Amino acid sequence: MEKVSFEQFKEGYLDAIGQDSDEVIRSIYDALKLPKTCDKRIGWIRFYAPRAITLKPGETAKIPTGIRAKMEENWVLQCYPRSGLGFKFRLQLNNTVGIIDSDYYNSDNEGHIFAKITNDTKEGKTVEIPAGTGFMQGIFMEYGITVDDDVEEVRNGGFGSTTK
C-alpha cells in the first residue's frame, strides 16, 4: 500500500470534496495514514479517513483515500465498512463491497482508491468519523478463473471498465 501522487490526490479530492486551498489539500495529503492491520492476528487492513466526515441520516460522501494497492495477479482487495460503523449506524459502501483488482494499480488515476459511503440509519443517528480514524476495512483475497477463460482484452480504469 502506498500513497498516490499529490497531483492525483488533489484531482480526486477536488472532484469528491470540492474546492479547498492547495495548502489545506497538501496538509491532508501529508497526514494520510497508510492502511494497516490493528492486530497481527487478523487479516483485515484498516483505511483511515483523510478528513473529518459527518453524515446525517441518508447522506452520502465520496472519500478519496489517497491510497493505491499493488498486488499480485489473481488477487483482489475487497473493501467493506468498518464493522462497528455498519452495526451502530448502518454505514454502507454504496457498491456494497468494493472490489479493487490488481490491474487497477496501473490505471490513469494511479489506482487511487475511492469509497462512497452512505449513512443508512433507521434510527436517526448522525455518523461522525474524525480525520485519521478507520472508516473502511479491506482484505486481500486470492481468486481463480475458469480453465476456458480466454479473455485477451486489457482494460484501463475502475467503475464500468469491464463492460467496455
Regions found by a protein language model. Give the residues of each.
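DUTPase catalytic domain/fold
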Residues: 1-164
